[in-house]
Each structure stands twice: as structure tokens, then as C-alpha cells.
């Protein structure tokens, strides 16, 4: 999957960053100038988009970090089998399976024929983010 690079000082809350090989959304960020001869440091608190775990990262603000390029796509639910959902992409008509979301509210709204927004994230992870339309 694709990713790009940015300096840590350019990022702000709401941006995405790769921490420990997982795409994360920055929820809190603070910058502190250290000593007379030290460089400024950035303290980043982020939530993993894959596992939902809270991750922290401290580095100089001029550090180059990986920024994931997340594709937001639309698909239709074809079937729900056990702990996976079969989706069809609404543009390419490709069919594939993604894990069933862990959020109860989202899981309860999934049924065959419903359109969903799913994200394709590095390293090739698919995740259903929300149900589209009013059901």
C-alpha cells in the first residue's frame, strides 16, 4: 500500500501517521523546546486504526515519519459469514472479504445489500468504517 513521508513538526491532530507499522490517527500532539543546545521534541498520542490501541511516540520535530495514504472507498455487503463480511466495491465490482467490525452499533446495521464505507490502509488492511445511507 502507499505511504508518503513528512516531518513530525508538520503534522497536527487529525492527521495520520505510521507507528510500529500500523496506521494511526493523531489525537493529541505537543511540542516542547528542550535545552539550550537540544532540538525541539514532539510528543504524539495516536489511536491505531487497526486495533484501536493508544500509542505514544516522542521524537525531534525534524524527524521524517511515514504518513499512510488511506483510500476511502464504497462497497456493498453481499454476505455475512461468521466473523467476516463479503463486500463488492461499487466502482471496480471486485469482491473480497473483510473482518466483521468489532463495534456493536456498526455490526448490528450490517446486512446484505447495505452500502458501507471501507478504508484500505497500509499494510493492505481493509476495515469497514461506517454504513452509508439511513438504515
From Swiss-Prot:
CDD domains: S1_aIF5A
Any one GO molecular function term: RNA binding
Organism annotation: Ignicoccus hospitalis (strain KIN4/I / DSM 18386 / JCM 14125)
Family: Belongs to the eIF-5A family.
GO CC annotations on file: cytoplasm
Disulfide-bond pairs as recorded: none
Lineage: Archaea, Thermoproteota, Thermoprotei, Desulfurococcales, Desulfurococcaceae
Protein name: Translation initiation factor 5A
Keywords: Cytoplasm, Hypusine, Initiation factor, Protein biosynthesis
Subcellular location: Cytoplasm
SUPFAM superfamilies assigned: Nucleic acid-binding proteins, Translation proteins SH3-like domain
Domain of life: Archaea
Amino acid at each position: 500500500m502507499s505511504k508518503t513521508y513528512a516531518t513530525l513538526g508538520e503534522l497536527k491532530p487529525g492527521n495520520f501517521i505510521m507507528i510500529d507499522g500500523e496506521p494511526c490517527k493523531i489525537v493529541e500532539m505537543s511540542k516542547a523546546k528542550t535545552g539550550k543546545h537540544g532540538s525541539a521534541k514532539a510528543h504524539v498520542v495516536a489511536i491505531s486504526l487497526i486495533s484501536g490501541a493508544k500509542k505514544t511516540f516522542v521524537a525531534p520535530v525534524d524527524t521524517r515519519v511515514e504518513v499512510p495514504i488511506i483510500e476511502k472507498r464504497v462497497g456493498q455487503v453481499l454476505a455475512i459469514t461468521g466473523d467476516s463480511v463479503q463486500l463488492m466495491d461499487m466502482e471496480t465490482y471486485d469482491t473480497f472479504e473483510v473482518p466483521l467490525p468489532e463495534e456493536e452499533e456498526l455490526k448490528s446495521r450490517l446486512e446484505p445489500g447495505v452500502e458501507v464505507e471501507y478504508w484500505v490502509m497500509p499494510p493492505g488492511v481493509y476495515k469497514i468504517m461506517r454504513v452509508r445511507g439511513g438504515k
